[in-house]
Amino acid sequence: MDKVRIHEIASELGLKSKDVLQKAQEMGLKVKSPSSGVSFEEAEKLTDYIINGPAEAVAAKPQEKPKKSAPKKEEKPKEEVKKEAEEKVAASKKEEEKPQEKKSVEESLTPPSLKKRRGLVIVKKKRPKVEPKVEEKEAKQETPQVTAEEETPLTLKRKPKKAKKSTPPAKKNEGKKIEILEDRDLSDVSMELEEEVVVLPDFSEELQKVEEEQKPKEPQKKNKQVKVARKSFAIEQQGISRSKKKKRKKKESKSETEIKVVELPEEVRVYEFAEKIGKSVGEVIKVLFNLGMMATKNDFLDKETLEILAEEFDVEIKIKNVLEELDYVKVYDAVEDDYLEERPPVITIMGHVDHGKTSLLDYIRNSKIAEREAGGITQHIGAYMIEKDGKRITFIDTPGHEAFTEMRARGAQATDIAIIVVAADDGVKPQTVEAVNHAKTADVPMIVAINKIDKPEANPDLVKSQLAEIGITPTEWGGEYEFVEVSAKTGQGVDDLLDTILLQAEIMELKANPKREAKAVVIESSLEKGRGPVATVIVKNGTLRVGDHVVCGVAFGRVRAIIDDLGKMIKERKPSEPGVVVGLDKVPPAGEILVAVKDAEEARMYAERRAEYERQKELSKTTKVSLEELSQLVKEGQLKKLPVIIKADTQGSLEAIKGSLEKLKNEEVKVDIIHAGVGAISESDVTLADASENAVILGFNVRPTGAVKEKAKQLGVNIKTYSIIYDLIDDVKALLSGMLSPIIKEEVIGQAEVRETFNVPKIGTVAGCLVTDGVIERNAKARVIRDGVVIYDSKISSLKRFKEDVREVTKGYECGLMIENFNDIKVGDVIEAYKEVEEAATL
């Protein structure tokens, strides 16, 4: 080991980890937690600092605990005794003991110094106190277990005192010291259990007697005596220190767990954590409670809470990725490519909606993609290849609509160079900034194409200045980004753009190995009639061939067909080439990595085990809600949901729609997506919608068949289909708005000032008023205002003019009125009449 952890030093010294950590920080060592490590040299300095300073006062009491330690530390001491015996028989003990001391310091950083201190104190203070019978056996036990480390410190300190006595006593002293040192573990807890220790005084007297008896005996015999003595010692001490032994056991187990590194999955419950660290669930819950967290044994613990608990229980945790052993991509990448050749660059075209991305690509490859997209807006990602001067370039076209954020992010991750298209007549827009951020996040080089340069209102300088504000400065202004002015309509500047792309690709030295199995990234996926699940991929490395066994996340299969960007069936795709793969068992999520493996069994193993993990993870998610949330949900009519079933033609569109609809919510209403899938609207979707109250089926680029329509009509299920995402989102907004409670606004209709009051027996107080503003209406709501303060809010129960009932009195006229349930009207009060107007709420 290169380093020693703070908690290890603490366990050796018998102190708490936090105390040692504090001392280390006082010394200026860079440590943050008990798990932090320090070098051996720093550990020695830290030990000396603790012992020679504040530890001196504590030294006397820790010594008292040796009694307990004797029974527990049998194994290690025996080995040490053998070493000592050999050393003693060999030659001069004093000279050999000193070098041993140095070695011991290296091996167990702090014990030697501690032991020295304890030895001294015990010899001085403990001799006068005697408890003869019990202590004899104790002495026997501890004497034989002398370690080289322990003897040395004692001899050094006791030389002067023992010189006065006979030579043999010197060895006895060593024996005594060893006893004390041997019980080091007990004294580890010195600070907490000082009051409990009462047996130590017996040791010193009895030790001397035992040592004198054992003096002539061979070291090997001592070993035997150790075993016997320990047994008797344990038996005799049972009545006296049983509780202490229990505590000691706990401490020993604690020191073991301190060294433990516990591996935990990302998702772990309280009881699972307790099992892993060897504690009871109650202990863990108690600690959580003390930290202010209420938890049951089935609750999940987040990473932050796990770190806090690890600190509390002095364990080191390591979060392991359960999928690591199922990471087929990692296995693929582990094989180094021994052969590399140049590959075409993969270019992603990104930018704001309607800025001409697809039109630009359309001009480059001379097709009419934009006309086929609903509303001329790109709804799907397309991947295409073109040739320029004998060199090929792969293009990915991403949608610019705000709902397709994730699709743009995937495009950025799968690409080598990003083309940011900005309209010269429109400037930088929100999705332009977002596209720039995606490219920066993916660490992809950017080229800016200023489109629509042919328009009279085009202002390329404005675009440059706007982009410079967000850190995209053109090279002509001293920046590092290439700006190319183009027109997708006339073709102006398109060749310059392609040349710039090829130049950038040449600088990047893009290479791959076409002579190995394929690795590809899924750009788009869908469920097609007659073909089943299909995935549009771009090969990143290797060659993808028809017949290959592939795994793609939780999907697997055999490549039955590959279709290129022109719709032709082909046999293989090489690095940077796009293709549509047919043959997977399910629709893979966009952005997933597809890898060719050696056989169907391996592909199935990866996919099925990953699918099982995902299923377990989904099932294990807690559904617990807080009391506050629960009380809010229980309030009548508080939260209204619009249950919807979404079906789309592609995975990317489905994700975009789900993301947009989940944002349509407030504290009163929200969209509840009860099912979402790729493919046509089926009868099972209609059945599910019927089972869910007021559910609506939303289809995007898919339509129901005749049988499905008929069933929906019979069950009264509403099916809405769309081809443009704007329309779908707007319709859902309208549906949600209809569920919102109307907004009630007050409208003041008039004011009247009380000029006189009349008390009418059995009726109440009538206020004679002059209307000063607006109109006073009978049965209108009214509030009585006195000195600017509202003192009553009710309604006008009676309104008369010249003793006749009237419906309303306008400004400038006098009237008599009564306020319902209020007779304390006084001259000078103001009556304010108002009505409540309901307005439809909108999201």
Swiss-Prot record:
Q: Where is this region: G4?
A: 451-454
Q: Which residue stretches belong to region Disordered?
A: 55-185, 209-228
Q: Which GO molecular function annotations are given, in alphabetical order?
A: GTP binding; GTPase activity; translation initiation factor activity
Q: Which SUPFAM superfamilies match?
A: Initiation factor IF2/eIF5b, domain 3, P-loop containing nucleoside triphosphate hydrolases, Translation proteins
Ranges where the record places region G3: 397-400
Instruction: Provide the protein name.
Output: Translation initiation factor IF-2
Compartments where found: Cytoplasm
Q: What is the native source organism of this protein?
A: Nitratiruptor sp. (strain SB155-2)
Assigned keywords, A-Z: Cytoplasm, GTP-binding, Initiation factor, Nucleotide-binding, Protein biosynthesis
InterPro entries the record matches: EF-G-like_DII (IPR053905), EFTu-like_2 (IPR004161), IF2_II (IPR044145), IF2_N (IPR006847), P-loop_NTPase (IPR027417), Small_GTP-bd (IPR005225), T_Tr_GTP-bd_dom (IPR000795), TF_IF2_bacterial-like (IPR000178)
Which region ranges are annotated with the description G1?
351-358
Taking every annotated instance into account, which residue ranges of this chain make up the domain tr-type G?
342-511
Q: Which superkingdom is the protein from?
A: Bacteria
